[in-house]
UniProtKB/Swiss-Prot annotation:
This is Putative lipoprotein SCO2725. Residues 1-22 form the signal peptide. It is a lipid-anchor. SUPFAM superfamilies: Prokaryotic lipoproteins and lipoprotein localization factors. Keywords: Cell membrane, Lipoprotein, Membrane, Palmitate, Signal. It comes from Streptomyces coelicolor (strain ATCC BAA-471 / A3(2) / M145). Residues 264-285 are annotated as: Disordered. GO terms for cellular component: plasma membrane. A lipid is attached at C23 (N-palmitoyl cysteine). InterPro entries: LolA/LolB/LppX (IPR029046). It is found in: Cell membrane. A lipid is attached at C23 (S-diacylglycerol cysteine).
Length: 285
């Protein structure tokens, strides 16, 4: 079975993982008129991001609306709406647009449910007449088959949609772009970025680094992270732009989400091996 939908993701996955786990900063060169003011403002920014990080980690889950645009697919947006959980390991339970995600060959419904839990992705598909999905309601793929072993390790260590917050707090230079209203809430807008040097220092394989750096170079050499934080010290929106993609995450509600569990094994067909081969071929591994 040829899984066309994976091709759009494979060449860019390494860069996406770097985006989620290594966003640094652009440097707020115009943040203040003097060195003392810059230090004071930098301290305030770090304090605000630290509070947001602590508060978000404490709540452990959220309802999120995500839109991803991939240059490889002509910029057609792929929407994913649902629950993300990071309190006890990485997990998500979302609905995504079937056609935009190129899943129409496996799912007739306009949206496809995707669950990520216990180190694997589960795609709700129509039972196929033959092959590993014959009579199965779900397609299982190991996270490592999509992201690579390093990406899977990063997800285990930093697997929540707000990982960017933790990495921005490690920088002494983050741009404070001022107050903005987002989703009807008053927020403060912060910005940082990651470049090839961050990829080189990552735990990605050499093939994955090559693919990530190539994707970064094709989009200007860096990936920019923007975060909008409200008065309750919670992110309202996070965007990541570059490396051949634009990802926007809007946080609708934090906490009090249902537990995410894997589908029954008897209803699941495993395509990890096939996806791994496609991914390795795409990045030349």
């Amino acid at each position: 079975m040829k899984l066309k939908y994976t091709a759009a993701w494979v060449g860019l996955t390494a860069a996406a993982m770097v985006a989620a786990t290594a966003c640094g900063s652009d440097g707020a060169k115009t943040a203040a008129g003097t060195a003392d003011k810059a230090v004071d403002k930098g301290t305030a920014v770090m304090a605000a991001l630290t509070r947001a990080t602590d508060r978000t980690e404490e709540l452990g889950s959220a309802e999120v609306r995500t839109t991803t645009e991939l240059d490889a697919t002509g910029g057609e947006p792929i929407s994913m709406d649902g629950t993300y959980s990071w309190g006890d390991g990485a997990a998500m339970d979302v609905e995504m647009d079937t056609a935009a995600a190129q899943m129409s060959a496996l799912q007739d419904d306009p949206t496809t449910r995707v669950v990520m839990v216990d180190g694997a992705y589960f795609y709700d598909v129509d039972p196929q007449p033959n092959g590993p999905l014959a009579g199965k309601e779900w397609m299982r793929v190991d996270v490592a088959a999509v992201t690579g072993e390093a990406g899977a390790d990063n997800m285990a260590a930093n697997a929540d949609p707000t990982a960017t917050l933790r990495y921005m707090t490690a920088s002494t230079e983050v741009a404070d772009l001022g107050e903005e209203t987002v989703l009807g809430r008053k927020t403060t807008h912060y910005r940082g970025s990651v470049g090839a040097e961050h990829v080189e220092r990552s735990k990605l394989t050499e093939a994955e680094k090559k693919a990530a750096i190539a994707a970064l170079k094709a989009s200007g050499g860096k990936l920019t992270c923007d975060i909008w934080v409200d008065g309750k010290d919670l992110p309202v929106r996070i965007t990541q732009t570059g490396a051949g993609m634009t990802v926007k995450m809007d946080f609708v509600k934090f906490g009090a989400t249902k537990e995410i569990t894997a589908p029954p094994a008897a209803e699941t067909g495993d395509l990890t091996e096939q996806v791994t081969k496609q991914r390795d071929a795409a990045i030349g591994q």
